[in-house]
């Protein structure tokens, strides 16, 4: 009798030595995705800066000024309402090479009042207050060119979008292993080339290429590890695969602290990809994919290898494998199926909004922390730590309480934390950090749960399409986020947090409109998906229960 891979793994080991070995190898892949996803915090760090004015350095040296005195005497003030632009993007139109300038308040010798001196653009570049370097300091991505930093981060999310859309087809067509190794190789090459890019344009091109393949490779790793384990372990393994990403956040903070120059940082975080090429000899092809390609003999050989590694033996009867697919009529899904009926249309709209919101808040909070934090390395490290309890809370709650309430609560906590942080005064920095960490934990939980629930709300024949369409909003959000964060902070540092707060609270409220999926079988048809939120009052079932009740006394 034909059996499925899950049936065989029950005898050959669902999560034993082989699967643990594969998980460790693929978890390393998950951890190295971190620098591409949120590395903008360190690669694009914008330090305090001011216009470079010819003659100022010589005058400062002659007068023996301290850095604070040089800043006070030669640089425009911050402007009204604490606006930083005049200080950072303008300079006095003064010839500092004049010998008439004294060493004590040199501008006082001019006939014009200091506040009325004309300001000009930074023609000679900028002076940056940092011992290291970033793409901002090297390519002068400040003032009129600051939008180029937004474009840099948006480009990697554009790559994520197209890479994620195409990876499902490519992995199904050519296999998981070949696709994984190809993405790793391209990612490694593009990462090194970006580290040695001579111009901003070339750097942008190689970052886009990294985006095209890096998230795709991360997703293939996720697919592989969930296909190697038995059905009972898939959800837990999937969550811990993303915990490995969190470990990558902690490592990234340490590496960035040790390597404050962006080219060395980019080169270092790219190096592990060359190690992953050795996976050619370590990781086999997915047996499930081989069966889908009618390569049952090779699939059986790999499964026997898995059983041997696990110290298990397979019964002689388990020799004929089949896919876990129904033999019924094949349906061709379309986007219209996601919006044709009222309940599925509601599910689609809410899921798309929540994917978008999760991406905007998760990436946005990290970017905003890089702008507002006192110590970006420690702030980044501490905020990453809260992702561990977030994963633990998901594991504890989703099968006990359900999906809907933890999901809604996590969105609302994230939104409320963002709004609360706006009104905390600057001298209570410790409280601001605690509230920010709560927000980060909330949105991390929401991000994880939406991945799980997305597949549980759609019927079988449109499930994959629904997941791909809805999750694509995650990358759309990632494209918008850098423009949202960096442009709004130019108006007011806390303004992005107000936007994040509203988005999070609305997302939490919308989640409550979705049905609970805990303990429910995955819907097979549109009718089942439409009736998920309604109690079933089936007449035949009622008659059956009545007959069953009457039969009991007769026995």
UniProtKB/Swiss-Prot annotation:
Q: Which reaction does it catalyse?
A: (R)-noradrenaline(out) = (R)-noradrenaline(in); (R)-adrenaline(out) = (R)-adrenaline(in); serotonin(out) = serotonin(in); dopamine(out) = dopamine(in)
For biological process, the GO terms are: acetylcholine transport; dopamine transport; epinephrine transport; histamine transport; monoatomic ion transport; norepinephrine transport; prostaglandin transport; putrescine transport
Q: Which residues lie on this side of the membrane: Extracellular?
A: 43-150, 199-210, 260-263, 370-375, 426-432, 486-494
Activity modulation comment = Tyrosine phosphorylation of the transporter leads to activation of the transport activity. Inhibited by cGMP, most likely through a cGMP-binding protein that interacts with OCT2.
At the top level, the lineage of the source is Eukaryota
> Glycosylation annotated at which residues?
72
Please give, as recorded in its UniProt entry, the membrane topology of this protein. Multi-pass membrane protein
Q: Which CDD domains match?
A: MFS_SLC22A1_2_3
A Gene Ontology molecular function term for this protein is: acetylcholine transmembrane transporter activity
Post-translational note: Tyrosine phosphorylated.
Q: Do you know which Gene3D superfamilies this protein is assigned to?
A: MFS general substrate transporter like domains
Q: Which intervals of this chain are the motif Proline-rich sequence?
A: 284-288
Q: Name one Pfam family in it.
A: Sugar_tr
CC terms in the record's Gene Ontology section? apical plasma membrane; basal plasma membrane; basolateral plasma membrane
Q: Which residues lie on this side of the membrane: Cytoplasmic?
A: 1-21, 172-177, 232-238, 285-348, 397-404, 454-464, 516-555
**What is the annotated localization of this protein?**
Basolateral cell membrane; Basal cell membrane; Apical cell membrane
| Transmembrane region(s) | 22-42, 151-171, 178-198, 211-231, 239-259, 264-284, 349-369, 376-396, 405-425, 433-453, 465-485, 495-515
Name the UniProt key words of this record, in alphabetical order. Cell membrane, Glycoprotein, Ion transport, Membrane, Transmembrane, Transmembrane helix, Transport
Extract the InterPro entries matched here: MFS_dom, MFS_sugar_transport-like, MFS_trans_sf, Orgcat_transp/SVOP, Sugar_transporter_CS
Any miscellaneous information on file?
A: Mediates the renal secretion of many clinically used cationic drugs. Transports drugs such as diabetes treatment medicine metformin and neurotoxins 1-methyl-4-phenylpyridinium (MPP(+)), famotidine, ranitidine, amantadine, acriflavine, amiloride, memantine, cimetidine, cisplatin, oxaliplatin, platinum-based drugs cisplatin and oxaliplatin, 3'-azido-3'-deoxythymidine (AZT) and tetraethylammonium (TEA). Mediates the bidirectional transport of MPP(+). Metformin competitively inhibits OCT1-mediated thiamine uptake, leading to a decrease in hepatic steatosis.
Q: Which family does it belong to?
A: Belongs to the major facilitator (TC 2.A.1) superfamily. Organic cation transporter (TC 2.A.1.19) family.
Protein name as annotated: Solute carrier family 22 member 2
């Amino acid at each position: 009798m034909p059996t499925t891979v899950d049936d065989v793994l029950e005898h050959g080991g669902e999560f034993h030595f082989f699967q643990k070995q594969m998980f460790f190898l693929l978890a390393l892949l998950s951890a190295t995705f971190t620098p591409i996803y949120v590395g903008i915090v360190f690669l694009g760090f914008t330090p305090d800066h001011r216009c470079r004015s010819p003659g100022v350095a010589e005058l400062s040296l002659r007068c023996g000024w301290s850095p604070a005195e040089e800043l006070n005497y030669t640089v425009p003030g911050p402007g009204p309402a604490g606006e930083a632009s005049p200080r950072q993007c303008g300079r006095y139109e003064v010839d500092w090479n004049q010998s008439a300038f004294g060493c004590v308040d040199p501008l006082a010798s001019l006939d014009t009042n200091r506040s009325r001196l004309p300001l000009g653009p930074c023609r000679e570049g900028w002076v940056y207050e940092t011992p290291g370097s970033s793409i901002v300091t090297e390519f002068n991505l400040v003032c009129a060119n600051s939008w180029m930093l937004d474009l840099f981060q948006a480009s990697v999310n554009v790559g994520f979008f197209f890479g994620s859309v195409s990876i499902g087809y490519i992995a199904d067509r050519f296999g998981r292993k070949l696709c994984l190794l190809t993405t790793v190789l391209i990612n490694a090459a593009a990462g090194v080339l970006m580290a040695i890019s001579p111009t901003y344009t070339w750097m942008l091109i190689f970052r886009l290429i990294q985006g095209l393949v890096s998230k795709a490779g991360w997703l293939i790793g996720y697919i592989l590890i969930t296909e190697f384990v038995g059905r009972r372990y898939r959800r837990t393994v999937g969550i811990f695969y993303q915990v490995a990403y969190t470990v990558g956040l902690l490592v990234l903070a340490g590496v960035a602290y040790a390597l404050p120059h962006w080219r060395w940082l980019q080169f270092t975080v790219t190096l592990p990809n060359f190690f992953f090429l050795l996976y050619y000899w370590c990781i086999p092809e997915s047996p499930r994919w081989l069966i889908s390609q009618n390569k049952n003999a090779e699939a059986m050989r790999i499964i026997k290898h898995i059983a041997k590694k696990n110290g298990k033996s397979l019964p002689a009867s388990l020799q004929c494998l089949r896919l876990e697919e129904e033999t019924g009529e094949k349906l061709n899904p379309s986007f219209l199926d996601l919006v044709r009926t009222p309940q599925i249309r509601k599910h689609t709209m809410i899921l798309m909004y929540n994917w978008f919101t999760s991406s905007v808040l998760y990436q946005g909070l990290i970017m905003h922390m890089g702008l507002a934090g006192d110590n970006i390395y420690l702030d980044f490290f501490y905020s990453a730590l809260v992702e561990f309890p977030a994963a633990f809370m998901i594991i504890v709650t989703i099968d006990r309480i359900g999906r809907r309430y933890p999901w809604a609560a996590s969105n609302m906590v994230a939104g409320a934390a963002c709004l609360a942080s706006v009104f905390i005064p600057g001298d209570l920095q410790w409280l601001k950090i605690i509230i920010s960490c709560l927000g980060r934990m909330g949105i991390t939980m929401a991000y994880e749960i939406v991945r799980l629930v997305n597949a549980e709300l759609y019927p079988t024949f449109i499930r994959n399409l629904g997941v791909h369409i809805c999750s694509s909003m995650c990358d759309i959000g990632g494209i918008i986020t850098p423009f949202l964060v960096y442009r709004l902070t130019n108006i007011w540092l806390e303004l992005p947090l107000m936007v994040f707060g509203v988005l999070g609270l609305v997302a939490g409220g919308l989640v409550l409109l979705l049905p609970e999926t805990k303990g429910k079988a995955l819907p097979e048809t549109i009718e089942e998906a439409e009736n998920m939120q309604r109690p079933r009052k089936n007449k035949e079932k009622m008659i059956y229960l009545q007959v069953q009740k009457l039969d009991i006394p007769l026995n």
